[in-house]
């Protein structure tokens, strides 16, 4: 399959090529769909602690730091065999396929991507974010100031990650069709280089990457273009094979509660969180860390996943309309045996609707 090139409209083959690369090479001719009877977690969710010796490989860098800084890591009832410092959706999917990652955190789009290429995994926890988390950054000396100015411009577009859906939603809200712009297929790890070299005119960046970029290139005319586009979901998800292992499923159940408690701790102890994560891990100043944290909305964990499923369906439909993935009923992506566990683990003020 050829590497996708910049195009006004990237189709399903382009999406799958970008989503895969080495992933699709490993996938071979993996089927696009499978029989649902063989695709659902088996049995009731274990309620007790995981058996002694149970381990998980966890790809949630922020959680590693939150649990260590808060002391919650002492409550882990299983061994973390490795904390894997990966977060891009395609990398996580490759890790799932290679059986090197047991649980990870991403936005809502990677589970859709995984299903599209036959990698079976399920969502086990949901966090909602009712505030924009991405800002469109322009290349140096750009004239772009609003989303309407995107017409005719080159936009960095990673279809298999949250940033890709943010682009599609921003275009739709600005009254622009995908064909009104040039969608340049790039993984998000290449967005900064593409902006710096003016390979693209604009790219969606999250924090602290946005702050680092504007600190370096703001003097050259780079700027942030905010929109009100929300990327609602942060999810924990795990391969179906992991969830069908009773010992590992019990460990995932335990981790869901600690993950949520770590997120809540970071909100309630922002000075410690800024120092541990933004300053010591991400290399930004304490002042920039404070500005970033103050710009965020309070994390919320829904006890009921109906709203999350509706949002995920809207995302899947948007991707299907663009020809990037086959149509999908996203209800199959959620393992509702875990529904409400994260919400029950945090104070009432962190629950959706509070």
Locate predicted features.
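Conserved C-terminal helix/tail region of periplasmic/extracytoplasmic solute-binding proteins
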Residues: 317-354
């Amino acid at each position: 399959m050829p590497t996708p090139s910049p195009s006004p409209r990237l189709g399903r083959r382009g999406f799958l090529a970008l989503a895969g690369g080495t992933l699709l090479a490993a996938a071979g001719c993996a089927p696009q769909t499978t029989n649902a009877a063989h695709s659902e977690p088996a049995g009731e969710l274990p309620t007790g602690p995981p058996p002694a010796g149970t381990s998980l490989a966890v790809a949630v860098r922020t959680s590693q730091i939150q649990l260590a800084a808060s002391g919650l890591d002492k409550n882990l009832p299983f061994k973390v065999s490795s904390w894997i410092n990966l977060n891009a959706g395609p990398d996580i999917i490759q890790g799932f396929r290679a059986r090197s990652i047991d649980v990870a955190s991403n936005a809502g789009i990677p589970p859709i991507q995984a299903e599209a290429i036959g990698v079976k995994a399920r969502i086990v926890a949901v966090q909602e974010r009712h505030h924009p988390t991405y800002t469109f950054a322009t290349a140096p000396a750009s004239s772009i100031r609003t989303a309407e100015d995107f017409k005719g411009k080159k936009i960095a577009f990673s279809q298999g990650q949250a940033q890709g859906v943010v682009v599609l939603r921003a275009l739709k809200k600005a009254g622009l069709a995908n064909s009104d712009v040039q969608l340049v297929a790039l993984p998000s790890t290449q967005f900064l280089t593409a902006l710096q070299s003016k390979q693209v005119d604009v790219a969606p960046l999250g924090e602290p990457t946005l702050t680092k970029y504007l600190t370096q290139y703001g003097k050259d005319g780079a700027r942030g273009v905010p929109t009100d586009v929300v990327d609602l979901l942060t999810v924990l998800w795990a391969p179906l094979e992991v969830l069908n292992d009773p010992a590992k499923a019990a460990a995932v159940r335990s981790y869901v509660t600690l993950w949520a408690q770590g997120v809540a701790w970071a909100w309630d102890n922002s000075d410690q969180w800024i120092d541990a994560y933004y300053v010591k891990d991400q290399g930004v100043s304490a002042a920039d860390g404070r500005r970033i944290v103050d710009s965020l909305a309070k994390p919320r964990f829904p006890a009921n996943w109906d709203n999350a499923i509706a949002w995920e369906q809207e995302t899947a439909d948007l991707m299907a309309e663009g020809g990037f993935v086959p149509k999908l009923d996203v209800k199959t992506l959620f393992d509702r045996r875990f529904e409400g566990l994260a919400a029950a683990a945090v104070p009432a003020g962190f629950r959706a609707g509070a």
